[in-house]
Amino acid sequence: MLKAVLKKSREGVKGSKKEAGGDFGSETPTLSSSGDSPVNSLSTTEDTYRVSLAKGVSMSLPSSPLLPRQSHLTQSRANKKSPGPVRKPKYVESPRVPGDPVMIPFREGSKPAEPIETEAKVDNEPSCSPAAQELLTRLGFLLGEGIPSATHITIEDKNEAMCTALSQGISPCSTLTSSTASPSTDSPCSTLNSCVSKTAANKSPCETISSPSSTLESKDSGIIATITSSSENDDRSGSSLEWNRDGSLRLGVQKGVLHDRRLDNCSPVAEEETTGSAESVLPKAESSAGDGPVPYSQSSGSLIMPRPNSVAATSSTKLEDLSYLDGQRNAPLRTSIRLPWHSTAGARFAPYKPQEILLKPLLFEVPSITTDSVFVGRDWLFQQIEENLRNTELAENRGAVVVGNVGFGKTAIISKLVALSCHGSRMRQVASSSPSSSLKTSDPTHDLPGTPLLSPSSSTSALSAARTPPGPGTVDSQRPREDAVKYLASRVVAYHYCQADNTYTCLVPEFVHSIATLLCRSHQLAAYRDLLIREPQLQSMLNLRSCVQDPVAAFKRGILEPLTNLRNEQKIPEEEYIILIDGLNEAEFHKPDHGDTLSSFITKIIPKFPPWLKLIVTVRADFQEIISTLPFVKLSLDDFPGNQDIHSDLHAYVQHRVHSSQDILSNISLNGKADAALIGKVSSRLVLRNLGSYLYLKLTLDLFQRGHLVIKSASYKVVPVSLSELYLLQCNMKFMTQSAFDRALPILNVALASLHPMTDEQIFQAINAGHIQGEQGWEDFQQKMEALSCFLIKKRDKTRMFCHPSFREWLVWRADGESTAFLCEPRNGHALLAFMFSRQESKLNRQQTVELGHHILKAHIFKGLSKKTGVSSSHPQALWIGYSTEGLSAALASLRNLYTPNVKVSRLLILGGANVNYRTEVLNNAPILCVQSHLGHEEVVTLLLEFGACLDGMSENGMNALCYAAAAGHMKLVCLLTKKGARVDHLDKKGQCALVHSALRGHSDILQYLLNCEWSAGPPQPGTLRKSQALQQALTAAASMGHSAVVQSLLGMAEEHEIEVNGTDTLWGETALTAAAGRGKLEICELLLERGAAVSRANRRGVPPLFCAARQGHWQVVQLLLDRGCDVNPNDKQGRTPLMVAACEGHLSTVEFLLSKGAALSSLDKEGLSALSWACLKGHRAVVQYLVEEGAEIDQTDKNGRTPLDLAAFYGDAETVLYLVEKGAVIEHVDHSGMRPLDRAIGCRNTAVVVTLLRKGAKLGNAAWAMATFKPDILIILLQKLMEEGNVMYKKGKMKEAAQRYQYALRKFPREGPGEDMRPFNELRVSLYLNLSRCRRKTNDFGLAEEFASKALELKPKSYEAFYARARAKRNSRQFLAALADLQEAVKLCPTNQEIKRLLARVEEECKQLQRNQQQKQQAPLPAPPNDSDNDEEAPASSLKDHFPIEEAEEEDTSSQEESISPTPRSQPPPSVPSPYIRNLQEGLQSKGRPASPQSWAGISKSLRETVAQPGLVMQPTKQAQIVKTNQHLGSGQSSMRNSNTKVQVSSQNPPPSPMPGRVSAAPAVSRNQHLEGTGPFSTGTGCGHFGDRLGPSQSLQLQRGESGTAYPLPSKVKAAERLLAHASVAVDMALPSQGGPVSCSDVRHPASLSSSGSSGSPSSSVKMSSSTSSLTSSSSVSDGFKAQGPDCRIRDRGTTQVQGGTAEHRPRNTPFMGIMDKIARFQQQVNPPSRSWHCPVTEGLLTNTATAAGLQTNSEKPALKPGGYCSQAKPCSVPPLGMGVHNGAQVKELEENKCQVPALCQDNRKTKGVPHLYPEGVSKQPLHVSTEAHRSHLTSAKPKRSFIESNV
């Protein structure tokens, strides 16, 4: 038969092993879909599915409940390999990577989830130090996306790097790296604390195993850690309460796709950082240096029911197959399209901080409980539970046990509490008859036998109810009963159902994992969820790997300890919480050979529960002994006759069912009407028969309701009397003949034998696996399944479970005297399942192999073969499994089979050919024998030794099985192994033998036994050692670990075995006393001193016990040693004292104690370092503070000239540095190498210290800037410091100094290189530009102010601050339209800023007023009164939310004078002949322009139309004026030469500095692009000024009359322009002071500059001037080196040059220009408008950089000259009309002549340092003629101006 069963095409199998798609069910994940999904929604390949099912297509039983399950059989594509992180494990012969399954339709109501990247997201936040973050926050500086994290070195990293020597047993000396004072790495003094600080140190041998390999990682595990949340997190973890009886989903649950994550590199016993990415290739093994897993007890109670399944190790929860896991991740329609291996390699290794809880709960569905069930009564039970749990005096108040027989409603009680709890959304609330309950639906055809769960009681949310339990004095006695269930439900935080149908629900690891998941999902424990997200190591501690390895440690460290800590921190409400567990007896069905069942696990863990965490469990009455030791109160449901409450509950249930069903009422009454007496009689009869069973009542009433039972008499003889009779009746109704049952029997057998629920397809394949010929058809099978649908309930994941555990038991076992009809044979089911695995085409994975072995053993089909043939049945069984799979060795070494082994299956695997020396994936790839020896599984060790396991097999750290057994304390295994010949003197790679391992853990009995064993005589061979050496090592090890019993035992045999109390061992080089002192083992030290240990005996490195104790901070040991005669001030080899050592390590208590004992505070070591120096070097602030208070010298220098402040700055603790500075440490101290503390901090990238020192006044020298090179974070801090200094000067009104600091900061910006992120610097640069713009605006240099604002906009186009700043500069320079455009942009970007809105309103009004004035002037051409538009208040910069706010409140004018635009039109004189000076004027105006908002273009052309006749223009400039011109030309020429511009540019733009007129030769095309760079700090590429705004009305009119409407000037107009321009030089001297400094219209952003507004064909002279009163050298001392910006080609629009129409806008000067505070000047302006003299436009046009060279020193200094000035020496002249530009065609025509006049206009105010700011208000505005009176009136109106403080917007 075996031959026939196994007969298959081997060549086909082998050929397809590497190509097949995947194991069905395990490697092809399930799609959970509702029962009401249409059948026709299946894909068209369904027939192929059926055919392949019959032919043995790859398939397996469902895998772990934490993995998705498959609903339809799918054929995978071949050769679909994963190119990603999944690698082929070396342990499996050739594991497949599953293919992509065929897409399966969604269930109805579900939506495809959005693809979610499975790669870990990298945090983009900058990882700079907290101090740097603090600084940035304080300054309000936004770093954007921050500096690349690679540029930051945290203090912790530096600590680790700097203290590497310390961790290696090396003390820091002057080089901060080397010394030999502390123990070596291998010394127990230095490293064993990692081995003993754990709780279970005496139980694990792993404490000295320091390999990076994990003890728990499985390189190809399938339940890896957190097989995280897939869409089934919510879908599969609910209950059947969400479903109707017909299987349809009541409320469509939308699937959410989450990623499958793995965080499995951390075990519960070894703390280690998790790997970065969820898809990290092979899981890192972790060091087992910690507590090893607690050995499992092997005790097992004798149970009433025999243990039918020892399947803990055969659980299909797969921990081994990565390929299986990835197959699950390829689940159709459930996972992201971008699968794990689609992520980029870069992201794969990025650090990952999980934002989700990567844990997944089990799926619990209770088939007998559905939404149409009702729950009646049990209020008394809930009340008793509540009273007992809240009774603090009761010893059994840790929980409650509800005991009851089969069908008594235990599961219904638990489900009621779950439904009303915070998890009610996952497990739908039980339906009830109350109006608030969910709508009930019922389908009689699908009514199933099951427990009654139903409840007419209110089902409102338990969270809102019962927050406060009812008081004891409540009058209404019923209310406490009703509130009890709500109170209990409101405290439920987790639940668990044990179901024999599903192995996973009965296993301890899954229990721990699922409980943890539900705890973090409960509303009450939100803090626990947050903690798991913050600390991924906790999630790793709770993953399935960790739970399999040591569930006790996982539960304790992953659940109980975090919850206790959160409770202590008051992050969890001060309430009691409850965990529900149903059916503990069910878990006994799957008791493992080794390890705990759930009941024994709870018994172990319950003492560790906090008193506020309770358990409510249920158990059958005949299994009470499994919970006999639990401190729980016991509540019984079996006390039926004696408990009236139980009786009332049963009656209430019957009454409810009868009244709610007309069918039942019609059945029991003759007339179909409700007769109370009859109903009461029926109720009483049923209650008496059921003996308290709700299940009996439910099934019986269901029969009544469907009409299967009809009561014809009062005897009720037709009513069954027991559950057995009810099941028999139901089966008889389903199967009318025996043959009908026989056809369905195989299905029941398979369902009984399976370890977990199976889908219809899996059952179908198992049935056909038993057929050699004539396979069953799918339609026939479907009919059988339909017949069994009332017994095998289909769950949400399409798997099937028995309707009730009692029915499952009834099918396999009957009591004496009961009918044996319908008995099933599970053995046949096991055989069918084994055949199914055998006929599977693809290779079985580890879990499937173990499961196959389980089914082969359970089937036992070769029973009796030995009697017939003499061959043991185990041989054919071994052949069977050997032929069926190739991965026997891998299955034997699977993780679950190691920790909870199935001995019988393991034997079968070994018989089949598994390698007993196979290396596992735990304990540093130890062989199986080593792992089992470590775990103490004696039976498995014996089995392995029986089959020849190698005794000398070692793990990667060199430990053999004897070392592991000795370290773990397994005495029996040590004896067994030594008797089998294990070598006692074997050394691992650390040089430790089994004797030392036992001494380290304190196992004195094993140590004594090993001493009595035979040791090798003679000289030790390599890898061995003598017994005396081992004993000396054991003494040191025991002393360091504090095992006094072992130390005493060893000292007692000192004479016999040559043990010296002062001896130094050969392993660590320690004496017993130095080891104990370094560990702080005071008791051992006292014992050793009593036994004669020398107090001053040093170890091999020369470190005495006193230094060992002082270094580790054990002051009690120090006191003991000093009391025994030690000197308090000894010196070691480096000259250090114990005080220095203690200070270096930061042990304040030890430092205090040593000083109290007279330790010298001023002692210096050989490097000149004191105790304070060492404390500063290591950053121990508390010690530093104490030493300084005790009088330590704060400026003590070492041999290298370093002070404690230098060392503290080197370490990087900002608070220590701050303390030292506040205590008087010299902040500018320079050591022998020329370094200061600030330089050291910068060099070490200690940003917090840099910030602290800068705050305290540290100066920035060249060394600091040099050290900051390539350190962007530090450089930003230094630049911010410069900007802060500038801000301070700005607030003090020192504009020049502030601008210098800003310029200096700009020069220090790094050059942009490849790979550098300049965004943070750009933000800072923007702030500097804005601050410079404010400075220039305050010094009246509006052109540069505008330019800097434009530069800020270049870097940050969306900066509303920059738009605002530029708008203010434009407004001040009378460019209202351009300012309006910028303000409108600013309002768009920041619509809530009130200051911008206020200024916008003003500018709009000014524009309107300007237009009105122009119209009035055209109607009545009279000069308008001056307009003072510069007294508007400017809001503080803080209102604009500048990055680095400068208090511009100081710019506010306290004057209440508002902008007043005179409404009266100015009388305009009649037009005159075009002036002959216009051509010279026009030549001067041809300079580079600046792009601006287009609105400003029209403003220029409009204002150009204004002409105002100004009298008194002299024909030649004065001598002094020519001198000024010469100076300016020299300055401009030097500037251009120094900036390496071409000589052509110099000659064309800067004519010879001669007082005689000269022509400017400038080509029309070239002159536009030529520019010079100024010498001043703000000399950027600037063109001519915006003087079009200043044009007088009369001049504009004259120009209009002279123009021909074309862009080319007529020859007749040329001379007039020449004559006008020739004498414009005087206006230079007059216009500058009249403005309080020239309005620099040199902003490259604005087309209002005249060179751009001129016709493109006209020549232009881009002359750049510097009108600074300071010298060139002083003005260039802080030059920023800005590159001059060339003209913008966008400004060639000629349309703006045509000045046509009479509606052109003009800009009258109705008020004095900004800064005029003199009342006389204002009065003259107001009362004498005709005498107003507009300053020459040539000054604005040609003095392109006027007032740009040195921040307008002229304006920032108070004038000293009298009103005469040099202007008083000038000849009277008529000032040309302001604003006359080359827009006018008439002017353009005259450009070819009199170019020699240009130099006359290019004057510098260099000699006007003391010149008052003259306001030529008295100059008569009359037709152009020379007038002495006009000259006099001009001079009288000129008033000195006070230093300008910007008070106007």
Curated annotation (Swiss-Prot):
Main location per the UniProt record:
other
User: What are the ANK repeat spans here?
Assistant: 886-918, 924-953, 957-986, 990-1019, 1030-1059, 1068-1097, 1101-1130, 1134-1163, 1167-1196, 1200-1229, 1233-1262
Biased composition annotated in UniProt, kind: Basic and acidic residues: 8-21
Region named Disordered: 1-47, 59-109, 264-309, 430-481, 1410-1503, 1527-1605, 1635-1711, 1812-1849
Q: Name one GO cellular component term.
A: glutamatergic synapse
Query: What does UniProt note about where in the body, tissue by tissue, this protein is expressed?
Result: Expressed in heart, lung, liver and kidney. Expressed in brain (at protein level).
Point out residues bearing the modification N-acetylmethionine. Answer: 1
Q: Which residues carry this modification: Phosphoserine?
A: 60, 63-64, 204, 267, 455, 1429, 1456, 1658, 1666-1667
Q: Output compositional bias ranges, type Polar residues.
A: 27-46, 1527-1546, 1593-1603
Q: Which residues form a coiled coil?
A: none
Which ranges are annotated Low complexity under compositional bias? 451-468, 1410-1421, 1649-1679
One GO biological process term is: dendritic spine maintenance
**Which ranges does the UniProt record give for the TPR repeats?**
1279-1312, 1326-1359, 1361-1393
Acidic residues composition-biased segments: 1447-1456
The entry's localization annotation reads: Postsynaptic density
Question: Which SUPFAM superfamilies does the annotation name?
Answer: Ankyrin repeat (SSF48403), TPR-like (SSF48452)
Q: How is it modified after translation?
A: Phosphorylated; by MINK1 and TNIK upon stimulation by RAP2A.
Family membership, please give it. Belongs to the TANC family.
Subunit structure, interactors included: Interacts probably directly with DLG1, DLG4, HOMER1. Interacts with DLGAP1, INA, CAMK2A, GRIN2B and GRIA1. Interacts with TNIK and MINK1.
Function as written in the Swiss-Prot or TrEMBL entry: May be a scaffold component in the postsynaptic density.
For this entry, the protein name equals: Protein TANC1
| Species of origin | Rattus norvegicus
**Gene that codes for this?**
Tanc1
